[in-house]
From Swiss-Prot:
Stored InterPro entries: 14-3-3, 14-3-3_CS, 14-3-3_dom_sf, 14-3-3_domain
Family: Belongs to the 14-3-3 family.
GO MF entries: phosphorylation-dependent protein binding; protein kinase C binding; protein sequestering activity
Name this polypeptide is given: 14-3-3 protein gamma-A
Protein role: Adapter protein implicated in the regulation of a large spectrum of both general and specialized signaling pathways. Binds to a large number of partners, usually by recognition of a phosphoserine or phosphothreonine motif. Binding generally results in the modulation of the activity of the binding partner.
Assembly notes: Homodimer, and heterodimer with other family members.
Native source species: Xenopus laevis
Cellular component terms per the entry's GO annotation: cytoplasm
Lineage: Eukaryota, Metazoa, Chordata, Craniata, Vertebrata
Record's keyword terms, sorted: Cytoplasm
Amino acid sequence: MVDREQLVQKARLAEQAERYDDMAAAMKAVTELNEPLSNEERNLLSVAYKNVVGARRSSWRVISSIEQKTSADGNEKKIEMVRAYREKIEKELETVCQDVLSLLDNFLIKNCSETQYESKVFYLKMKGDYYRYLAEVATGEKRATVVESSEKAYSEAHEISKEHMQPTHPIRLGLALNYSVFYYEIQNAPEQACHLAKTAFDDAIAELDTLNEDSYKDSTLIMQLLRDNLTLWTSDQQDDDGGEGNN
């Protein structure tokens, strides 16, 4: 029998050492024990995989940019090598995303009770995020499928959060942040992105007195990110130019 506490301890240790693959493996094993995760365990899982997938997303962007420049040069051998390397990174990224999505579907979302709204929103947001990361690298029909899955998860989380969570709750705010980025970057729908981000920001401002002391820092940081994105996106619309949001 695997000792759950030992696995969690290992994940904490791996985080301090910035060994995120080890951290993710430990938290995957904890999740597969098929018991609900505590808030700390949930966050450890999220941080681990965010860093693991983040490294691949960053590499993919760099190589994609090099690929575009190389295509212009017309050096066939180099073009082929860069393309093969991009595809290798894509496969790694897809494997990580599928790992997370299967943990969410087979254990985490499945095991949420009807009244565990916070956990349900957290995990559905995560589901939306990892389908969004797949959408960043997918093309054609495959892209259409993952975009639809991402939208569905975000939308369900959004409805639950509006009904059961304070507008200042960091998980509700974080969901609005990522959902609006999905609209802007993946759906190419700047008006929807701005509307969602502005509504979330305004609703939180209107209820600042409900800010929980424990989550004050998290909530205000996400509100700042929402505002930064709004500033960027509205200026992009005025310039009629594309831009990138955070997250």
